[in-house]
Regions:
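Accessory nucleic-acid engagement/destabilization modules that flank
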Residues: 1-259
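Inter-Walker segment of RecA-like/P-loop motor cores
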Residues: 348-359
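Walker A/P-loop
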Residues: 289-312
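Conserved pre-motif I regulatory segment
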Residues: 260-297
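Conserved Walker A/P-loop ATP-binding site and its immediately adjacent core
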Residues: 322-346
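Walker A/P-loop NTP-binding motif
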Residues: 304-322, 340
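Residue-level preference for the first positions of well-ordered beta-strands
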Residues: 72, 293-295, 323-325
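Catalytic cores of nucleotide-enabled group-transfer and carboxylate-activating enzymes in metabolic
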Residues: 253, 257-262, 309, 342, ...
Length: 359
């Protein structure tokens, strides 16, 4: 920010002198509202520019997520760090006590005598129609607040973390966040759409999506600390678009650049290649819009890798997958496979639209 941090500010991220917290000298800070917008914008971008939208819909048994559903999931993403308004988290910047993380206080609210007294400032009561019932909403919120890769079990609630002080009022911080989220995603609150059902796999997948969005939204090479709180969502959406492009998460350009007749000739770099029998068999396996599982077992040297690449090309061209993942048992095998896949990708895609191959 373009001014020093004060105890009345709600910060999300800090930069210390020499990147060393022990110095106690904060040289820059990123506001909670700005980071909330960053992660929400990445979530929105991933749901509108990648296959993840289809994947989440399929876990529910739906054909697609509506734009209202996307807005609602993006709005939930904006609430992911709501626990940072607590006294315990904000105190970490000023050497005060008590201190706490930002996940467990939010989850522990579930064990408060009146959880809604703490969640109401976030507008939670207005979300009841987003899900099949309040239990589903509760689990979806747990997936939202517990976004650091492992489940968080509610524990003892500490009301002291939520009490107001001379410097800050956590309730006011939640209210302000809710106000902005409604401005950023009006369709989430004003639109109508079928309620999210009680589907644990969907909740789990949303948690994974949010974890990815938080990683990307926390990368300062894409999301530098804000200088001002003017138009945080406009800024966030611009950075999110740049990040999705830079990370090759949107495959549309690569898909469009793929030749319509790409096959074993291009994969192997051998014109007029006559496929092995197992390769012909894999080539002819049907593609299913709702997904499928193909199991290939064959002798070493029979061309299984190229067969898998040929199937990937067909799936990718049709928009049924965004990428390809090989799982092999040893580093040596992985290195050899990486070299072969890299060579095939170079032959399949022009340089400026070539998807990355990582190991």
């Amino acid at each position: 920010m373009d001014r020093p941090l004060t105890p009345s500010d709600f910060w999300a991220k800090l930069k210390y002198k020499d990147d060393d917290r022990s110095t106690g000298e904060i040289v820059d800070w990123h506001p909670l509202l700005a980071h909330s917008a960053d992660v929400a914008a990445v979530t929105e971008a991933l749901l509108t520019r990648t296959i993840l939208r289809d994947r989440l819909a399929s876990l529910i048994g739906w054909d697609d997520l509506s734009d209202v559903h996307v807005a609602r999931l993006s709005a939930l993403a904006a609430l992911h760090d709501a626990g940072k308004v607590t006294q315990g988290f904000q105190n970490r910047a000023f050497g005060r006590t008590p201190e706490s993380d930002h996940v467990t206080p939010m989850v522990n609210v579930y064990h408060a005598s009146d959880p809604l007294a703490y969640l109401a400032p976030l507008g939670i009561t207005d979300l009841k129609d987003w899900t099949a019932d309040l239990d589903v909403l509760g689990h979806l919120l747990l997936a939202t607040f517990g976004h650091h890769g492992t489940p968080v079990t509610p524990g003892a609630h500490d009301p002291m973390l939520w009490e107001d002080s001379d410097d800050r009022d956590p309730e006011a911080g939640l209210t302000r966040l809710d106000t902005h989220v409604r401005e950023w995603f009006p369709a989430a609150y004003d639109g109508t759409a079928p309620a999210f059902p009680a589907t644990p796999a969907f909740q789990h997948a949303f948690n994974g999506l949010l974890t990815l969005a938080d990683w990307i939204g926390s990368d300062t090479s894409f999301f530098p600390f804000a200088d001002t709180l003017d138009a945080p969502m406009e800024r966030a959406r611009s950075h999110a678009a740049e990040a999705v492009d830079a990370l090759f998460l949107d495959p549309d350009a690569s898909r469009a650049a793929l030749s319509a007749d790409s096959g074993f000739d291009q994969i192997l770099g051998q014109p007029d290649w006559d496929p092995y029998p197992i390769q012909e068999a894999v080539r002819d396996v049907p593609l299913h819009d709702n997904g499928g599982l193909a199991v290939l077992e064959s002798d070493t040297g029979s061309g299984k890798t190229e067969a898998a690449l040929a199937r990937y090309v067909r799936l990718f061209r049709k928009g049924l997958v965004d990428g390809l993942y090989f799982a092999v048992p040893t580093r040596t095998a992985a290195t050899q496979l990486h070299d072969r896949v890299t060579a095939a990708v170079k032959r399949l895609f022009p340089e400026d639209q070539r998807p990355p191959v990582v190991q």
